[in-house]
């Protein structure tokens, strides 16, 4: 099994790239992490609700094109389930033991995720009700994936 992180938009800030690279390096071959960046749709300043929904659907179609049959899909959503690090570790472990495909985490674009992506998801995770920049959320999620692996291996990293 591989863990994939499908994200909408390009990561620009060096400090975030460096932080993510550090956790990816630490994970090594334990449970490989692949990050897939998808181009975000350009949103006109005066986009109507209908136009915004069409853009969100196009981004959703791009996301779903990266999901294979058998993959376990966890999306980040403000209204999702609040989880502890231990609960996330349990989810990762079950996907590793019982899964038939990869474990895929998704961070959507500034418009959020399409209804189709929500319907395909196996789990909706919330990191709280606060809005965080999508690029910062990548670092937070990658750290939590690393932490989950350390919990599952009985490491002292998680205290």
From Swiss-Prot:
Organism lineage: Bacteria, Bacillati, Bacillota, Bacilli, Lactobacillales
Species: Lactococcus lactis subsp. cremoris (strain MG1363)
Protein name: Ribosomal RNA large subunit methyltransferase H
Main function: Specifically methylates the pseudouridine at position 1915 (m3Psi1915) in 23S rRNA.
Gene: rlmH
Gene Ontology, cellular component aspect: cytoplasm
Main subcellular location of this protein, as a coarse class: cytoplasm
NCBIfam families from the UniProt entry: PRK00103.1-3, tRNA_RlmH_YbeA
Pfam families to which the protein is assigned, alphabetical: SPOUT_MTase
EC class (word): transferase
């Amino acid at each position: 099994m591989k863990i994939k992180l499908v994200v909408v938009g390009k990561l620009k800030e060096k400090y975030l790239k460096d932080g993510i690279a550090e956790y990816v390096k630490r994970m090594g071959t334990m449970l490989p992490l692949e990050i897939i960046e998808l181009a975000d749709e350009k949103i006109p300043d005066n986009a109507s609700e209908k136009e915004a929904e069409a853009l969100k659907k196009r981004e959703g179609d791009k996301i779903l094109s990266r999901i294979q049959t058998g993959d376990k899909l966890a999306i980040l959503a403000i209204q999702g389930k609040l989880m502890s690090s231990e609960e996330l570790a349990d989810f990762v472990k079950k996907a590793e033991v019982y899964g038939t495909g990869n474990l895929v985490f998704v961070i959507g674009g500034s418009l959020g995720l399409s209804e189709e992506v929500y319907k395909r998801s196996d789990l909706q995770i919330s990191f709280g009700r606060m809005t965080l920049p999508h690029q910062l959320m990548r670092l937070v999620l990658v750290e939590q994936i690393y932490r989950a692996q350390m919990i599952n291996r009985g490491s002292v990293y998680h205290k």
